[in-house]
């Protein structure tokens, strides 16, 4: 520090002369003495000289070749001058290579221009590519890789888009319902969200962004799009009051937490979501200023998780039978089906704990019946047999479910009683 700040005459003692030529005027040399010494001294020249920074650094990040370079020279100079390391942690990453794992060279024409990727897919795709990669080894990059990743990005974005669309007109300050008004599947979705918080928090803590990416992707695609959002579509479209508000309350809580989780990676997308999201008092204008959601607030006990794992297993078996019925031209869409579930006492008790209309929604069929005893097609769930037939009644033009109540409202002869009441409301 003294060397950088002081003039030559302040460093050299008065009267000092050159032994060779006898000169007494001194000038500081601006040449680099040693590249590793200079770069290894940056903790003193940068961290300690800038008031907005602090010593030691939270992290030094570089490629693996720097263990004998910058990492080492920084450690040596800091230990020698201060007795401690200049960093709290070190993160080492591999190199970016092409799709075949070869080094990129201009002469080979195998480089990837970030501006072209941004033009085609947006800047968040590059950030998602980094997060989805195992950076501890060499990372492959290429147009095909970014194209594939754009599909994953689209699924995450579409999950948020679907939820936002169904929050239209929802005011979280007045419309949120109490926990005891949520359906069981709503509580399952929030429990899945809590698991996401646990996994992403653990990933961020150790810079394992690949773990964060996979947790978010699986949550959006498997837990949300393929299951929860699919099951709740009918409730959102065809009911008013507590049932719809319960689904919206659940979706709102999910979207708020999910957006905060993806913000460090998909910073532009998360802010776009945040801008369209209904707010409660105290929310920041920018999502990056929000605290990460804390796990535990929606956690479910193991018995509840086991119950819903079994219900999902039953649903999967029903889907297999529906596919067979579709192949045999018995039904077209799943809502054309009436399902009979033959159960032993254990399975009957499990399924009977869910209201029949909610159970039909879970299976995405018009009608469901529980029967104690054996029957139907054998399944992978012990004590369960499944049979499918065409649903009775007529098809509602609004919800597409089959019902005997079609035309019960004179003003709406093609609607079921439920949809007629929604239209009249």
Language-model features, listed with the residues they occupy:
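Structured secondary-structure scaffolds
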Residues: 1-170, 189-232, 249-263, 395-398
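Cys/His-rich finger/ribbon microdomains and the adjacent scaffold used
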Residues: 1-55, 62, 179-196, 271, ...
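A generic structural signal for well-ordered coil/turn residues at beta-strand boundaries
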Residues: 14, 38, 86, 91, ...
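Acidic, turn-prone loop/beta-hairpin segments
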Residues: 26, 170-198, 229-321, 325-349, ...
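Short, contiguous acidic/charged loop-to-helix segments that flank catalytic cores in large enzymes
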Residues: 50-51, 59-66, 241-249, 302-310, ...
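Short beta-turn/strand-loop junction motif enriched in small, turn-promoting residues
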Residues: 76-81, 327-328, 404
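Conserved NTP-handling cores and scaffolds of large molecular machines
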Residues: 160, 318, 325-329, 403, ...
